[in-house]
């Protein structure tokens, strides 16, 4: 089990590294002078806030740990989180459609309220459009979000697989677990959330 822990820890560190690079890229579109140390400080500060808030909403408070452009950086942090959630749910939908193709219409219809909520929030947040328009590398941001999701899903797979070899059903079910967890309205400190959803 020692090797398994090392592998899981490596996945976690790689996931943090990817999030760091993505956040640095986003934040520099507003604050070009932001150095890597301050970017990491902001990322970890937001993660700490997310850990003690329902739904990890505190993560969007990364901007308060920086000296300038706090409001704009808070908007970008919200967009960063939203992009990750969209990718998570997209991967979960892919897994669900592969596992339960007979329910594909119902699964697609279930996304409608989620899409309406995103559109409503986007239109309501007036400052978002102006700030987001300053980001020129959305392809890279989405790519980092996909990679981050895959790393954390791989870590979870390694934790639940035990001594068993790879099983396609388990591999497809893990994105579904992450998607369901992402859509839960309250997930205080993430304690046992993924495990409960997995059961």
What function would you assign to each model-found segment?
Residues 44-61:
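Short intracellular "coupling" helices and adjacent cytoplasmic loop segments at the cytosolic face
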Residues 28-29, 51, 62-68:
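Helix-loop junctions at the membrane interface of multi-pass solute transporters
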Residues 16, 56, 77-81, 192:
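Hydrophobic transmembrane-helix microenvironments that flank and shape a buried ionizable site
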Residues 36-38, 69-85:
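Membrane-interface alpha-helices at helix entry/exit sites of multi-pass transporters
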Residues 1-43, 88-186, 193-196:
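Predominantly cytoplasmic-facing regulatory/coupling regions of multi-pass membrane proteins
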Residues 65-72, 195-199:
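Interfacial segments of multi-pass membrane proteins
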Residues 62-65, 74-77, 186-187:
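Hydrophobic alpha-helical membrane segments of integral membrane proteins
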């Amino acid at each position: 089990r020692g090797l398994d822990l090392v592998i899981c820890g490596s996945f976690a560190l790689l996931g943090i590294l990817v999030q760091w690079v993505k956040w640095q890229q986003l934040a520099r579109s507003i604050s070009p002078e932001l150095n890597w140390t301050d970017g990491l400080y902001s990322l970890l500060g937001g993660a700490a806030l997310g850990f003690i808030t329902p739904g990890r909403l505190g993560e969007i408070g990364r901007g308060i740990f920086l000296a300038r452009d706090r409001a704009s950086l808070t908007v970008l942090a919200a967009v960063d989180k939203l992009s990750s959630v969209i990718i998570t749910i997209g991967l979960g939908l892919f897994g669900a459609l592969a596992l339960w193709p007979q329910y594909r219409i119902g699964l697609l219809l279930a996304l409608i309220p989620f899409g309406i909520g995103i559109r409503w929030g986007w239109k309501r947040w007036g400052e978002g459009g102006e700030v987001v328009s300053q980001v020129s590398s959305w392809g890279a941001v989405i790519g980092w979000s996909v990679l981050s999701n895959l790393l954390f899903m791989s870590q979870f797979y390694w934790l639940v697989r035990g001594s068993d070899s790879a099983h396609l059903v388990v591999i497809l079910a893990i994105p579904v677990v992450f998607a369901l967890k992402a859509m839960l309205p309250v997930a205080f400190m993430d304690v046992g959330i993924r495990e409960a959803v997995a059961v």
